[in-house]
Amino acid sequence: MLPFPLILAGFFLAGTVGQAQDQAKNSKNTGSTGNGIGRYSIGTAPAGYNADGKWWKEAIVYQVYPRSFKDNDGDGIGDLKGIISKLDYIKSLGVTAIWLNPIYNSPNDDNGYDVSDYRNIMKDFGSMEDFDRLLKGMHDRGLKLVMDLVVNHSSDEHEWFRQSRSSRTSPYRNYYHWWNAEQGKPPYRYSLFDINHDAWKYDSLTNAYYLHYFSRKQPDLNWETPRLRQEVYDIMKFWADKGIDGFRLDAFQFAAKDTTFPAFPKGFESKFSQYYAMQGNLHGYLQEMNNEVLSKYNVMSVAEGAGNSFEDAHNLVDAGRHELNMAYAFDGVDIARPGGYSLLHFKEVFSRWDSAFADQGWLSIFLANHDQARLVSRFGNDSPEFREPSAKMLATFIMTMRGTPYYYNGDELGMTNAGFDRIEDYKDVAARNEYQHEKNTGGDLGQFMKELQFGSRDNGRTPFQWDNSTNAGFSSGIPWIKLAPNYTTINAAAQEKDPNSCLNYFRRLVRLRKDNLVLVYGKYTLLDNANPNVYAYTREWNGIKLLILLNFTSKAATVDPGMGMAKAIPLLNNYRAPAPPPTPANNITLRPYEAA
């Protein structure tokens, strides 16, 4: 047994104990934390590794949904001052960057993803002075800021659109996609959020239709227009000049269109991404954006969505193409279904993406965000018995995979789905419009509500559960959306006091990843790949091999890692009771949702 505790879900396999001791002794991270856990480094970076010094490769990103994080002024809506008041909490997690959902001025049809003014702050959130204070507070604490850039579409209340729809001869007309009605009805395009799923909306003012892939209040911008592109680059420079550290390009894979609008085959809606993503001159626009803005500032860039193939994703983030830095692919998070999911499929998807990016490009690793229901409710088990171990197990997965981890606010507590049973309690435009569509077409509303309870985006947007006081300490007013009813038992204040809570386990995982570069750059190898219950893999780098074993089920499960365990050193376990020591036998039995 080592003279200092190693903290990792798995076993220390390769390299000698003396090697680990020597590396710990020589590490600049050697020291002690308040809970008596040693800090050290396994696998010092070889000379010249990550020589480009890109901070985002070793970053750990914490996503803050501002509307639901912390309300300062008592109006029931989270705001920038509320975030400022909780920066010390965020810093205490050990994360290194914050991704902030849109705070721009917006009529709020889609919770800020319908922007009416890209250079001003939504009044619900505060003022530009508040933003400047927030940014300074983050930088003072060593935290970087990544902002959402929503430029596939704008709000229909943006001045660009007001001018565009005013006249067919308006200089802003081509900022958007229009189809004149005398040409007949435009070829059908599917809308994700429209009540009728029709992406063309007729506008009588100029007797024409405008295109909206999302809600009818989110008209799509026409990136073929040079003047529009320059407007966007100027907006990016405005924020980069303020000192932000990165942009996440929301839905940008859909920005380029074939503006001849050919007819698509019947049923294309079921695979609309193949027809919408990575079309036209998208790469040309990104290369121009890089040349005009990204290359001139010390900012990172991440693409929401990664096209329809590994080649698409590589083309977005291949450094030699001078486009973006990081891919944010949804294949993994899209696996979860109300009836469950196959771990074999889960392993296959994440292994494929890791293999594809092992030597080229850079990936994000995540299982939840503002567009998903809660992590533990979708991929784990949110029952009282298994919520804590399964939430910890899933956190272990995210923090031990290759790529930049993104963690959504509240998931560090193991917050669960709210599971509202009345449509009136849902605020999401997509949920409300789809409910109305089901009602209009005679759909099964009972079944639809069950699907919402499992998968609605609003499950991930309920207020952050700070404590067990009124409104979970989120607001002194009436929250904009109902709280999850279990906030009295699942909250940050309670977990701060418990060294074995989800929150404190998350902090240990974050610190470990930061201190051990094998978890950032190490080779990933899938083990026991046909095991339907356990995800087993190694991370290997610079003479160090770490084994991670994750039971994804509510029953005990056995795994054969395919290697002798006699000399393995246990590092971390997500259970409150310690795991039994490994035996010389290859097979290892894991408790329900155990990470060991």
For each of these PLM feature ranges, what is it?
Residues 5-15:
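Bacterial N-terminal signal peptides
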Residues 21-596:
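Active-site and adjacent substrate-binding regions of carbohydrate-active enzymes
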Residues 1-3:
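Classical eukaryotic N-terminal signal peptides for Sec-dependent ER targeting/secretion
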